[in-house]
Amino acid sequence: MYFNNELSDQKVCLLRELKNLKYSDDARDRINFFLWELKFLDCFLHLKSFPFASECGMLHVSQKMIDIWKSHCSKTINGTILYYGKVPLNLFVNWKKVIWKTKQEFRAQYSFPKTPLAANKVIDDDDNTHSPKFVMEVIDVFVENLNVLMKINDPCSWFFVPGHMKEQIEQVLKELKLLRFFVCFVSNKCSIQPQYRCTTFYTHALIEASHIAMVVWLHLPIYGNVNQDLAPSEVSRLFSDFMEMKIKSIQPVISRNNIYIDVLQALKSTIPQAQKKHAAESSTVEIPTHSLTVGLSDQMANLQEMLCLLRDNLIHLPILDLEFHLQDMDSVIIDAGLLIYSLYDIKREKEDTVLDDMNRALGLDLPRNIEPIKVMVYLVMQKAIQCNLPKVHGLGYVDFLLKNLKDFQGRYSDSLAFLKNQLQVIQTEFESLQPFLKVVVEEPQNKLKTLNEDCAIQIIRKAHEVEYVVDACINKGIPHWCLERWLQDIIEEITCIKAKIQEKNTVDDTMKTVIARTSSKLARTPRMNEEIVGFKDVIENLRNQLLNGTKGQDVISIHGMPGLGKTTLANRLYSDRSVVSHFDICAQCCVSQVYSYKDLLLALLCDAIGEGSVRRELHANELADMLRKTLLPRRYLILVDDVWENSVWDDLRGCFPDANNRSRIILTTRHHEVAKYASVHSDPLHLRMFDEDESWKLLEKKVFGEQSCSPLLKKVGLRIAKMCGQLPLSIVLVAGILSEMEKEVECWEQVANDLGTHIRSNSRAIVDQSYHVLPCHLKSCFLYFGAFLGVREIRISRLIRLWISESFIKSCEGRRLEDIAEGYLENLIGRNLVMVTQRANSNGKVKACRLHDVLLNFCKERAAEENLLLWINRDQSTKAVYSHKQHAHLAFTKMDNLVEWSASSSLVGSVLIMRYNPYFARCPLYAVSHILLNFKFLKVLDLKHQVVIDFIPTELPYLRYLTADIGQNSIPSSISNLWNLETLILNRRSVVHKILLPSTVWDMVKLRFLFIPNFSPENKKALLKNSPNLDDLETLSYPYFARVKDAELMLRKTPNLRKLTCKVKCLEYLHQYHALNFPIRLEILKLYRSNAFKAIPFCISAPNLKYLKLSGFYLDSQYLSKTADHLKNLEVLKLYYVEFGDHREWKVSNGMFPQLKILKLEDVSLMKWIVADDAFPNLEQLVLRGCQDLMEIPSCFMDILSLQYIEVEDCNESVVKSAMNIQETQVEDYQNTNFKLVLIEVHY
């Protein structure tokens, strides 16, 4: 809508005067009020061509108001501003009085127009002001102006309207919006040439909207209006009467065969093809639904329920799916409208008419008329769920569903009673398909791979639907008739899937042997310390720059396109033994495109001084100062990987002091400008492409390992290597494909043909191909990495817990889910899709990994396409979220506020806060706890990054994974409502006070991982007597044991623990060395003392323990000797802050630690260490830190043939000397070329 020319000129003049002036909030309020009045007047003037505007006085009052403005107000206002040079507070007061007086004069005279509609027709001609669009624009202006009154709550504002009147305005707004939606619906469905009935309806709509706007304008707002002819209560009553008599769109001016019936009948006769967006469609359903509420809600409740369901689900349909059903929906909406308006017409004539009388009068069979609406409602609801399901998912979802079906039928037997038979059939059907799903996982490369995977995905999608139906039944969100029909359709579809499987003989031929067979495809042998291929000349030159060159600090910048191997090359140099031994400190960080300055500093400090010494609560500038002081006296090597901008180097370089001691920094970047900007002495290195020989050697190495390729394969292999464009990333990805295939020429030729046409022109093509050949059980695991954008390293323990909670891991009888998940990961590593960044020293298991940026971005984009993952940025608008499929199975966010998009995500399965945000550190995110209740299907909630919640959401029955910071010292007993929970990680900012754990936690029998710092059971007697065992619990962290009995009790309740971290206090059995029997499967034990005592009150008995850490205790040789008798499988022993008794002496006898591989002593008060020759026969690593009282390392370490590594830091000279003697003996006498000695001198 545009202003009338006269008004527009005056408005422009006024705004020009106000533009450069300063004015108060009160003045601004009055200016806005003035503009609000002008906007109403402009609309009324636009209606001057219609007879009804003159008849009711609308045109007359509007024109008079304009004359008043031109003759009095405009000159007064402009003159005042010119004179005073500012906006006085009373500027509009006099003019406002004039306006109100004029309104009073016309209020009593104004009446609803009686001119026949035919005389007021809106004609859709060349004049755009006479069209349905014009009607909607008029309504939009009225709605916008009325919304202003709804938003103002300040009683001093000129716009203020009391609350009881706001309720009336709110109802007016609702009616205007419904009327506007109906106009939109009719105009969208009309044929190109407008029909008489439609144009009559447009006029009717325009008259109604204009009339209500005039009434509102004449009476509101009332603030500051003295000598009113109506009191506020009378104005309120006027609105009530008006609402009853005039505005209801269901009450037409023409009774019987009214406008609404006429226009709907006209549309029904010629329903056109779908044209417009689905948003208008869902809103249009509101019209007959609302009419039902007003007129016949007592007799038409079922119809009302169906139309509400239709409205609520339309918004969740993608455009393409909606347009497919649009014509049918048009028919349903029109039929519903005709039915309702016809029934209302009869009832209005005769108030006591019953439903049967109406049916006879109209010749209707109401149940039969409602049936098509039922069908459409069901189809739309079903489609709204199906079209938003993930296109890929883990095959473990059926396992989760089957467990839940049993639990739900037990917990909600009354609600599910009417579906009991169908649910039992579905459960039986899914159980019968379990062997087939095992085949899909264990034989991914058989000849029926594509068919099997298609069927598997269909099965998983049906499992999702069953879950939704069961939940809807329990929560009474969908009528029973719809649920029964849905489950019956699911049963029939599962039957069809089974028939398809059996038709192709996949069940009969392969299921018989699947249980007895373990596939080698699930896992691979870990590849340790792989030698880098290629770039030998480059490595030698860079090594020389690192070890020699300028005496001052130097930056070695490596730049080049993605996939060249910059990071691999830099890491190769960073871990080179000759390089590492040259520097006192080595530290690295990965920047990426999105980074946190504090995270970078923490990463560097953890490498420089050890993770345990880093104070994470410090601010970034404090951490930077700590890093600078740590590096200053030493020669250091820093690796800064993947720098995108000069500003990153500006942030970091102040932390790297130049002590003129040949310190070096390796920097990798894609951009030459960044490399040049960071360079100091050495010129940036532009990393070249591989040559043909290097390309082939890398491909051969990745496919065959230490073996060589046959001559027949080499010919086609050389061609494939050349096709990769001399890009190392492409080569290793293709090698990952080839390594999964038979070593046959035909297979390799097929790969060459698949790659040949597009790999050179599209770098993503090879990634697409690598993804395409993945087995379906690995696709979701791989795409899940897209959630970790900007993460330097991904901890495997966390990744695997998330995979399990997401149902990506298919269970296998006799195997732990964690072990299966590790097999999946090794498979992805073997395909060169995942890079290992850290392995455990003792057993070689992967501890951390990362993806190349190219692969990471692919995962993010493809996961969005597959509706698996939706990454939402904090500044992303709600509209952008709605543009995606609203029910992506996973949602990841960096937003401060979940409110804006939570309403569209009720079916989301996961919410993860993936990056630190200062907002979260400043204050609790109170909204989160309440908003999370909207995510009723939530299975994973990871609020790890300093999101403090004010209470634990316990109404999420599907939740399997919860990580958050909490503010309270106790946990509610209602936490047991989270009966599906498997991982529970709750942190507190302060751990001074113990957290009380309710006894109901022990009812959560599915728990596998429990981490709560410094917790203590609330009711120990209840724990002993009433609670079940937590048989699935494998990791328990930070219980506080005040007595040995408490520890014994908890250990009895957790018989299958594998990892335990705890604090102990009690002094019982101090001199008796009472043996505390830990669970038989326990492999990792970390014990910390409380501040109250030093001695360990028990002897540790754990026959399968492999890792033991003791911190802060008083120990003696006798205690350690007795403990060692029960720990014959111990591989790692770490003693921190330990005080040795017996004159600070430790005697280790023969055979005491027969399997020990790693021994670490840090800040221990040990002076004399006596070790028998055969005490550590398999020791590989010895680390001594802060052992300043130790006299020397026993000489028997010279003869330990398995020894590979000794690290000495902050110890006296005699210890350093003995370490060097051991090195000499190991290397020169025993030719132990793998032995490495690291000496770190601490400067204060």
Curated annotation (Swiss-Prot):
Molecular function GO terms recorded: ADP binding; ATP binding
CDD domains reported for this sequence: RX-CC_like
Localization: Cytoplasm; Membrane
Principal location listed in the UniProt entry: cytoplasm
Swiss-Prot/TrEMBL keywords: ATP-binding, Coiled coil, Cytoplasm, Hypersensitive response, Leucine-rich repeat, Membrane, Nucleotide-binding, Plant defense, Repeat
Entry GO terms, CC: cytoplasm; membrane
Membrane topology qualifier: Peripheral membrane protein
Misc. remarks from the entry: This protein is encoded by the haplotype A genome of the allohexaploid Solanum demissum.
Function summary: Confers resistance to late blight (Phytophthora infestans) races carrying the avirulence gene Avr1. Resistance proteins guard the plant against pathogens that contain an appropriate avirulence protein via an indirect interaction with this avirulence protein. That triggers a defense system including the hypersensitive response, which restricts the pathogen growth.
Protein name: Putative late blight resistance protein homolog R1A-4
